[in-house]
């Protein structure tokens, strides 16, 4: 929301308070990368400054003093890798054939668990795209033995097994099979509680880990899944304190840290490579591991090329000259390449990174730098969608407008290649709704109005920018998205509303204090407190966390419901974008200050290959 005229604000506004935010420390990167990186260590405080960049008369503006770009363009352009050599691709292709044979060579003993473990391993290693047919055959086989009590380790098992059943419940549900969580009722004792022994054996711990993972794909009103999550969480927290550091303890910590909704497939693959030998001791895990490492590094070479393109786009667009905005294009690209590692989807990854960067630039213009008069002109120009509309814009806005205009049109061209039709009208409608939502927030500050929670939340679902970050990137994919399917994904569909709502709520819990420090009073927290006199910040946060928890279950249902009219593949990338953006808010606002977690994510999933 923008700082505008000096109209008096509501009593709950913070513009009359200190505009200095808390100091954020930028810690050094790991030594392997540090010598070639340079960034300006900044204290991202909020202050008032005078600028004469747009007119003869000085204009008073707020600037958030965001730290500069961490990833120097010269460094990005200097990246090189040996993994583009054909020999690596040839070796990977041979291994793909050998792994396919592994799918076909499973014996009758423990055949259900073996198939599930094989599917899980290729998915967690990030190589599942090579084995779609094998995965479907394996899961069809497992599902054919599924019953109201779950499954055992093998087709001839007399008794159902918690480990196999929990793993199957999660895996089958994620692949769209109609499986009920009621099977978990059969693993409770006579008192209706999940039972376990006093001695935590490795087998039991693995069973409870799979129960925990299954509980994260719960649908609304699945009480047994809620009970499973509570029980398994308590059990695993105790177990990890007692068992020695091992592949099992690391897997527990990783899964409890990232769960499912903030887990990134490429990050998981990087972590799982070190442990999967121990996880699949009864199979030829060496071939899987070698293939996973080769695929990781071959994709790493593609990441370097894409990152160089993105960095040139950022530099050529003139964004590097805008010192009042956040520069997070590398971080956004990292998130995109952590959820989609298909070499054919370069346009998706680059499009997502560009759209997110444009959102961030506009967020900083509307939040801090732009005046109300400028914002009205810019909003009108976006709606006209014509370069001549920039005539009355200040110089800095002219450049931004043209980059938005050219990038959106370029993305529409990419979408036409894959969808076979012009999609620019979808994009224009999304941008108009997005920019209108920003103007509404600016007007709230200008008038001193603090909206109701519901009014803020509904507008905030649009102003978050999820629709912009998703729409054009997914249209570049080789997944048919005709109008009737697209309407189920984009705003105001139920799917889009849930995703946008989750991210708006989660984002506000991470940003509201910094936003309030620079005079942006309206947030889910402040609006809830205003609607409920006497409510504390803790009350508001508890309410919002409960909302997010329930919305997550509804979101799971919208993606995975068995009678889905829209294929999971059509919604999967939009769902994964939600996971990626959610990941950035896991610890704090990773988009305003690039914290150590975000920096390490860039290093481990983009900049550094894995040792072969």
Swiss-Prot record:
Gene Ontology CC, one term: chloroplast
Protein name: 1,8-cineole synthase, chloroplastic
Species of origin: Picea engelmannii x Picea glauca
Gene3D superfamilies reported for this sequence: Farnesyl Diphosphate Synthase (1.10.600.10), Terpene synthase, N-terminal domain (1.50.10.130)
Cited function: Terpene synthase (TPS) involved in the biosynthesis of monoterpene natural products included in conifer oleoresin secretions and volatile emissions; these compounds contribute to biotic and abiotic stress defense against herbivores and pathogens. Catalyzes the conversion of (2E)-geranyl diphosphate (GPP) to 1,8-cineole.
A GO term, aspect molecular function: terpene synthase activity
Superkingdom: Eukaryota
EC number in record: 4.2.3.108
Gene (UniProt): TPS-Cin
Signal sequence, start to end: none
Catalytic activity: (2E)-geranyl diphosphate + H2O = 1,8-cineole + diphosphate
Transit peptide per record: 1-52
One Pfam assignment: Terpene_synth
Binding locations of Mg(2+) 3: 515
């Amino acid at each position: 929301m923008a700082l505008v005229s000096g109209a008096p604000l509501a009593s709950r506004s913070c513009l009359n308070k200190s505009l200095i935010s808390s100091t954020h420390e930028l810690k050094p990167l790991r030594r392997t990368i540090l010598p070639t990186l340079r960034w300006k260590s900044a204290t991202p405080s909020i202050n008032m400054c005078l600028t004469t960049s747009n007119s003869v008369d000085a204009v008073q503006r707020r600037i958030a003093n965001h730290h500069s770009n961490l990833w120097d363009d010269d460094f990005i352009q200097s990246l090189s890798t040996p993994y583009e050599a054909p020999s690596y691709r040839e070796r990977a292709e041979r291994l793909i054939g050998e792994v396919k044979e592994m799918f076909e060579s499973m014996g009758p003993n423990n055949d259900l668990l073996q198939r599930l473990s094989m599917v899980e391993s290729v998915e967690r290693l990030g190589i599942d795209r090579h084995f779609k047919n094998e995965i479907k055959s394996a899961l069809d086989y497992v599902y054919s033995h599924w019953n109201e009590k779950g499954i055992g380790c093998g087709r001839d098992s007399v008794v159902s097994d918690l480990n196999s059943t929990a793993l199957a419940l999660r895996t089958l549900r994620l692949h769209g099979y109609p499986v009920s969580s009621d099977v978990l009722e059969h693993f409770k004792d006579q008192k209706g509680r999940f039972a376990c022994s006093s001695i935590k054996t490795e087998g039991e711990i693995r069973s409870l880990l799979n129960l925990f993972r299954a509980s994260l794909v719960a649908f609304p009103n699945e009480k047994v899944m809620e009970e499973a999550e509570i029980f398994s969480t308590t059990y695993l927290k105790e177990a990890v304190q007692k068992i020695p550091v091992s592949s099992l303890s690391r897997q527990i910590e990783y899964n409890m840290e990232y769960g499912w909704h903030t887990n990134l497939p490429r990050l998981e693959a990087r972590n799982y490579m070190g442990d999967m030998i121990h996880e699949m001791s009864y199979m030829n895990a060496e071939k899987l591991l070698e293939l996973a490492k080769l695929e990781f590094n071959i994709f790493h070479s593609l990441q370097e090329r894409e990152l160089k393109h993105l960095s040139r786009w950022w530099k050529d667009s003139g964004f590097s000259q805008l010192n009042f905005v956040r520069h997070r294009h590398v971080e956004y690209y990292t998130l995109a390449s952590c959820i989609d590692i298909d070499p054919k989807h370069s346009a998706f990854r680059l499009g997502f990174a560009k759209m997110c960067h444009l959102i961030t630039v506009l967020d900083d213009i509307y939040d801090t730098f732009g005046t109300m008069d400028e914002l009205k002109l810019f909003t009108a120009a976006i709606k006209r969608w014509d370069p001549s509309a920039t005539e009355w814009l200040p110089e800095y806005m002219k450049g931004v407008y043209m980059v938005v205009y050219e990038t959106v049109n370029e993305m529409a061209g990419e979408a036409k290649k894959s969808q076979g039709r012009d999609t620019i009208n979808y994009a224009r409608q999304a941008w108009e709704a997005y920019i209108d939502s920003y103007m509404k927030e600016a007007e709230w500050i200008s008038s001193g109005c603090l909206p109701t929670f519901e009014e803020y939340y509904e507008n905030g679902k649009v102003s978050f920018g999820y629709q912009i970050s998703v729409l054009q990137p997914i249209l570049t994919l080789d997944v048919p998205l005709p109008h009737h399917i697209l309407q189920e994904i984009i705003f105001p569909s139920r799917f889009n509303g849930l995703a946008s709502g989750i991210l708006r709520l989660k984002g506000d819990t991470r940003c509201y204090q910094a936003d309030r420090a620079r005079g942006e009073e309206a947030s889910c927290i402040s609006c809830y407190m205003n609607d409920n006199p006497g409510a504390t910040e803790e009350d508001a946060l508890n309410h919002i966390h409960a909302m997010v928890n329930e919305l997550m279950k509804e979101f799971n249902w919208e993606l995975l419901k068995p009678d889905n009219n829209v294929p999971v593949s059509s919604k999967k990338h939009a769902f994964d974008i939600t996971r990626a953006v959610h990941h950035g808010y896991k610890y704090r606002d990773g988009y305003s200050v690039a914290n150590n977690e975000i920096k390490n994510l860039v290093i481990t999933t983009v900049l550094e290959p894995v040792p072969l």
